[in-house]
Amino acid sequence: MQKMDRASFGSKIGAILAAAGSAVGLGNIWRFPYEAGNHGGAAFILLYLACVFIMGMPIMIAEFTVGRRAKASTGRAFGLLANNSKWNVIGMLGVLAGLLILGYYSVVAGWTLEYILSSVTNGFADKKPEDFVAAFQSFSQDPIRPVVWLLAFLFFPHYIVVKGVKDGIEKSSKILMPVLFILIVVLAICSMALPNANKGLEFLLKPDFSKVNADVFLGAMGQAFFSLSLGMGCLSTYASYFDSDTRLGKTALSVGVIDTFVAILAGLIIFPAAFSVGIQPDAGPSLIFITLPNVFQQAFGGIPFLAMIFSLLFYVLLALAALTSTISLHEVVTAYLNERFKISRNRAAMLVTGFCVVTGILSSLSLGAWDAKFFSLGFFDLLDFVTAKLMLPLGGLLVCLFVGWYLKRSVSYEELTNYGLQKAPYFPIYMFILRYFAPIAIILIFVNELGWLS
């Protein structure tokens, strides 16, 4: 297998923070707390943790194995390891998924900038609950403002990716991730100090095993899979920048712990604040852009400055979570174009950003001015459906089958143990999960996401 000279992360902490940044995203904040609170609290969290460490980490290690062994972008890595370019279809699925996800995810990321501005200008003050609904609908359906924020947001991942692995991705991760941690801890402490916050803590953390059933188990598996950025090529691309001393198992464990830490702390922000004013939180964009602005104003309404600061910090937190995810998605496609077509990183990044501008504009317009339907879905929802419900589970499944069944066990063992320098007594269990449990789990996630088990 021919390997090319390749950039690498300059430190182990840089590699861990970059990989964790890929995993931490908006889903940690707008989906996990809702799922946990409504499906058994601590019982769901325990189930989720089991799914992360039993299913998620082995798949993550498998992606790390492919990337570091091949020392190539995900679009080329599988073919290089198999000595057969036909296997590149697995990596290309991740490249295409990353490109399409960027097209609509960046739109939502741009919304966070609008809400940062609204926080700074005290635009949420003196509004009634129904005003937040009208304001969000008016903004998201506007043909101009969301597009302006989309373009503004895309500048940041583009600039960071152009700067390269060490000076761009690693350096930014060492800044963005600690700031994100500080913000989420400060916001959680402030939220838990509110009156009646204990009701929110009880809702999130009190175990209710009576709510745990097959549907909740499938939901926990799905949340673990999507939260860790599996199946989209980000982790294998980043792993291609790992040095030979990086311990894949330890790195995967660190990423899993950080991702879960952020998700739980997001719940400690949302539920105490919501219950302090008697509001039942929902999930998704409506939670972030309708419910929470209302919650923050009511919770701190007696002190407008505090309401403004809390809201500002929260939307900065959201923007950072979105940015770390989009950097990794952008890098997946940029690295592939750079290697496959021998073009400069700058030109490759320009092509990716240009595509994101086009698909982002179409995604944004499909929420309002452009009402065209594809299979009964608007363009934004179509991209979300095709990537989240089809491409990512399929990509994760193919990674499991490739590493579990096709790739030589000796290759997996060498990568996991750094050629025998580290011990890996769990290797047989890891291979069993990768061969049998993980594929079955992903198939169940796939059919559940499509609603076939309902």
Where in the sequence are the language-model features?
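Transmembrane helix-boundary motif of multi-pass solute transporters/channels
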Residues: 11-49, 199, 236-239, 250-253, ...
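Membrane-embedded translocation segments of transport machinery
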Residues: 2-5, 9, 170, 174-323, ...
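Inter-helical loop and helix-membrane interface segments of multi-pass membrane transporters/permeases
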Residues: 3-7, 35-39, 69-93, 106-162, ...
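A generic transmembrane alpha-helix motif of multi-pass inner-membrane proteins
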Residues: 378-401, 423-454
